[in-house]
C-alpha cells in the first residue's frame, strides 16, 4: 500500500507489451513521446538478445541438429527423385509417402520427447529393467509401429478413394505400409535409444536435438525401406495373404497394448493411439495435396522433388523443437497453459524463427547447388530460392502457433504433452507445410 492508501501499480514486465506506453506517449509532444517510449521500444530487442545469450548452448545444439537434418534430407530427396519409376508403376504411392515418413517422426519423436522430459525431471536411467522408463517407452513404441502401420494402409487407400485418386489395391497399400514401417522402425528405434542415452551421458538438450535428428533419420531410412516394400505389391495371391497377416498383426498389437499388464506402456498406448490416428489422416491428406501435382510439377522440375522431403521435415522438426521445449516447461511449471502466451514462449518462438530462416536458406541453396551439379532441372535460381524461403518462413510461423497451442491444450486437458503434442504438430505441419509449399509454387508462378 502507498501512503495515500492506494495499491501500487504492478510493473509491466512482459516483452512486446510496450504498445500501451507508445500510445500514451503519442498523446504528449513528439519530442516527449520519443523520449518516453524509446527505452520501451528497445526493451524487447534487449530481452531477445539476453535470452539468446542465456540459451546459446541450446540454440547451438538446435542449429547443428536441424542443419544435419536439412543436409541428410537431400539424401531422402534424391531417393524420392529416383523413385519416379516405381511411383508410376504403383499408382497413388505418393499418398503413402508423407504418412510413412511422418509416422517415424511421430512415434519416435514423441519417444525422444518423453525421454527428454524424464531426463529434465531426474527420472531417466540407463537400465534394462522392464519396469524402467526406458524399457516401457521402447515397448510402447514397438506396439505403436505395428498397429499404426496397418491403419496407415487402410486409411491411405480409403482417403485416396474418397478424393478420386487412382491407386493400387488395399492389400498392396497395407503390405507396403507395414513392411516398410517395420523395417524402417527397427533402425530408427535403435538410433533413438542411442541418441537418448548419449544425450543423458553428455548433457545434451534432447528437446532441441531429438526432434530434428530423429526426423532426419526417419526420412533417410524410410524411403529406401518403402521402395523395397513396393516389390511385394501386385504378386497375385501372395499380396492379399501378406496383407491379411499384416492386418492381423496390427490388430493383435493394438489389443495387446490396450490390455498389457505393463501399466506405463498401457497408458502410453491408450493415450497415444487415437492421436496417432488423427496424425495419420493429416499425413495422408498431405500426400493427397501433392499427389495431383506429382506428374506435372515434380517430374518437370526434379529439383523441387529433391527439396520436398527436407521442406516438410524441417517444418515438422522446428515445430517439434518448440513443442518438446514447452512440454518440458509445462511439466516443470515454468510456462502457463493459457490463450495468451507467456513472455518466455515468445522468446522461444524467436529462437524458432531464427533457426527457420537460417536452415531454409541452407537447404534451398544446397538443393540448388546439388541440382546444378547433377544437371537436374529447376524453374530458375532466384525463383527456386524465393519459393522455398517464402514457403518455409510461412510454415515456420504456422509451426510456432500450432506448437504452442497444441502443447497448451493437451496440458489443460490433463494429458501428456509429450504423447499428444509431437504427433499433432509433426503431422499437422506435414499437411500445412505441403499447403505452404503449394502456395509458394502458385505465388512464384511455378504451379
What are the roles of these predicted feature ranges?
Residues 19-56, 112-137, 250-265, 323-346:
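Non-transmembrane, extramembrane segments of multi-pass ion/lipid transporters
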Residues 61-80, 151, 278-287:
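The first (N-terminal) embedded transmembrane alpha-helix
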Residues 66-67, 94-106, 138, 142, ...:
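Transmembrane helix-bundle signature of multi-pass membrane transporters/permeases
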Residues 110-129, 190-212, 264, 298, ...:
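Juxtamembrane helix-loop transition segments at the membrane interface in multi-pass membrane proteins
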Residues 111-164, 318-373:
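Helix-loop-helix junctions within the multi-pass membrane cores of secondary transporters/permeases
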Residues 156-182, 234-241, 255-268, 293, ...:
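Membrane-interfacial helix-loop-helix connectors in multipass membrane proteins
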Residues 176-188, 237-250, 395-396:
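Structural signature of hydrophobic alpha-helical transmembrane segments
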Residues 269-339:
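Transmembrane helical segments that form the transport core of multi-pass membrane transport proteins
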Amino acid at each position: 500500500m502507498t501512503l495515500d492508501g492506494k495499491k501500487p501499480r504492478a510493473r509491466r514486465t512482459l516483452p512486446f507489451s510496450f504498445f500501451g506506453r507508445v500510445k500514451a506517449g503519442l498523446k504528449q509532444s513528439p519530442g516527449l513521446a520519443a523520449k518516453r517510449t524509446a527505452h520501451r521500444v528497445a526493451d524487447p530487442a534487449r530481452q531477445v538478445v539476453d535470452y539468446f545469450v542465456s540459451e546459446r548452448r541450446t540454440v547451438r545444439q538446435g542449429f547443428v541438429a536441424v542443419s544435419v537434418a536439412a543436409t541428410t534430407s537431400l539424401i531422402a530427396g534424391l531417393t524420392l527423385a529416383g523413385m519416379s519409376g516405381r511411383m508410376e508403376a504403383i499408382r497413388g504411392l505418393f499418398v503413402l509417402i508423407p504418412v510413412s515418413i511422418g509416422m517415424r517422426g511421430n512415434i519416435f519423436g514423441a519417444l525422444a520427447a518423453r525421454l527428454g522430459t524424464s531426463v529434465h525431471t531426474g527420472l531417466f536411467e540407463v537400465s534394462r529393467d522392464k519396469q524402467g522408463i526406458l524399457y516401457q517407452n521402447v515397448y510402447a513404441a514397438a506396439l505403436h509401429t505395428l498397429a499404426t502401420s496397418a491403419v496407415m494402409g487402410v486409411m491411405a487407400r480409403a482417403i485416396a478413394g474418397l478424393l478420386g485418386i487412382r491407386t493400387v489395391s488395399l492389400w498392396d497399400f497395407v503390405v507396403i505400409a507395414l513392411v516398410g514401417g517395420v523395417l524402417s522402425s527397427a533402425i530408427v528405434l535403435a538410433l533413438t535409444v542411442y541418441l537418448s542415452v548419449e544425450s543423458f551421458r553428455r548433457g545434451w538438450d534432447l528437446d532441441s536435438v531429438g526432434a530434428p535428428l530423429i526426423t532426419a533419420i526417419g526420412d533417410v531410412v524410410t524411403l529406401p525401406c518403402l521402395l523395397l516394400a513396393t516389390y511385394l505389391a501386385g504378386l497375385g495371391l501372395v499380396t492379399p495373404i501378406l496383407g491379411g497377416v499384416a492386418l492381423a498383426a496390427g490388430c493383435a498389437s493394438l489389443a495387446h497394448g490396450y490390455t498389457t499388464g505393463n501399466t506405463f506402456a498401457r497408458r502410453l498406448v491408450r493415450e497415444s493411439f487415437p492421436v496417432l490416428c488423427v496424425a495419420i489422416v493429416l499425413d495422408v491428406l498431405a500426400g493427397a495435396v501433392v499427389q495431383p501435382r506429382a506428374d506435372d510439377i515434380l517430374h518437370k522440375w526434379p529439383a523441387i522433388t529433391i527439396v520436398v522431403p527436407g521442406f516438410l521435415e524441417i517444418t515438422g522438426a522446428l515445430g517439434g523443437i518448440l513443442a518438446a521445449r514447452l512440454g518440458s516447461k509445462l511439466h516443470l511449471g515454468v510456462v502457463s497453459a493459457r490463450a495468451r502466451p507467456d513472455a518466455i514462449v515468445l522468446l522461444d518462438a524467436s529462437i524458432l524463427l531464427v533457426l527457420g530462416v537460417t536452415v531454409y536458406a541452407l537447404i534451398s541453396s544446397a538443393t540448388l547447388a546439388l541440382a546444378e551439379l547433377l544437371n537436374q532441372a529447376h524453374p530458375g535460381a532466384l525463383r527456386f530460392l524465393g519459393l522455398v524461403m517464402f514457403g518455409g518462413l510461412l510454415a515456420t510461423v504456422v509451426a510456432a502457433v500450432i506448437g504452442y497451442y497444441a502443447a497448451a491444450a493437451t496440458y489443460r486437458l490433463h494429458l501428456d504433452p509429450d504423447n499428444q503434442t509431437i504427433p499433432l504438430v509433426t503431422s499437422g505441419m506435414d499437411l500445412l507445410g505441403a499447403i505452404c509449399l503449394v502456395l509458394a509454387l502458385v505465388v512464384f508462378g511455378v504451379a
